[in-house]
């Protein structure tokens, strides 16, 4: 399901959005390792590519991974897609790729019945907060922020609380 996206100036850009394969897992891990994002095990990225490919998106330029979204639809919330992580290569930052990745996810057939998108974000992660608020604004819907995981739940002392950002409902 390769999708070439049209750039803001009307030209077709060279970024292709697709479902990931297990081979993409290592590249996702490497991208996160070289960023400020929380690095999960390499197994997590490979597993997401294998078992949740329908709800994950990779962005490639010249066959090189430049961004991704890992997400899933929780079994008890079939109207919600939960975004675990959004990663964008430094070469693509500030170009709207994260927004395009989220929109590519929401346009997938698997998200046909999705009315909400959720993600957890730390209070200090202003870039992610802005990304999800912008998504809500562009889709003309609401953002609700609520407490999710408090600091005391995390075994390491450096982890901030995680807030749930719930965007929706979406209209089709």
UniProtKB/Swiss-Prot annotation:
Matches recorded under InterPro entries: Acyl_CoA_acyltransferase, Ectoine_EctA, GNAT_dom
Enzyme nomenclature, EC number: 2.3.1.178
Recorded metabolic or biological pathway in which this protein acts: Amine and polyamine biosynthesis; ectoine biosynthesis; L-ectoine from L-aspartate 4-semialdehyde: step 2/3
GO molecular function: diaminobutyrate acetyltransferase activity
Domain N-acetyltransferase: 15-166
Keywords assigned by UniProt, alphabetized: Acyltransferase, Transferase
A Pfam family hit: Acetyltransf_1
Biological processes per GO annotation: ectoine biosynthetic process
The family this protein is said to belong to: Belongs to the acetyltransferase family. EctA subfamily.
Protein's name in the database: L-2,4-diaminobutyric acid acetyltransferase
């Amino acid at each position: 399901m390769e999708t070439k996206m049209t750039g803001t100036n009307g030209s077709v850009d060279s970024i292709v959005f697709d479902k990931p394969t297990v081979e993409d897992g290592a590249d996702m891990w490497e991208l996160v390792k070289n960023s400020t994002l929380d690095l999960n095990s390499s197994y997590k990225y490979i597993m997401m590519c294998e078992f949740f490919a329908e709800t994950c998106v990779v962005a490639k330029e010249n066959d090189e991974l430049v961004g991704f979204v890992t997400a899933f639809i929780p079994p008890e919330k079939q109207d919600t897609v939960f975004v675990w992580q959004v990663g964008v290569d430094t070469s693509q930052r500030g170009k709207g790729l994260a927004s395009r990745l989220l929109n590519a996810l929401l346009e997938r057939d698997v998200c046909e019945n999705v009315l909400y998108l959720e993600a957890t974000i730390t209070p200090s992660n202003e870039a992610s907060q802005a990304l999800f608020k912008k998504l809500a604004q562009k889709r003309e819907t609401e953002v609700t922020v609520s407490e999710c995981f408090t600091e005391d739940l995390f075994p390491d002392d450096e982890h901030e609380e995680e807030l749930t950002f719930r965007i929706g409902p979406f209209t089709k």
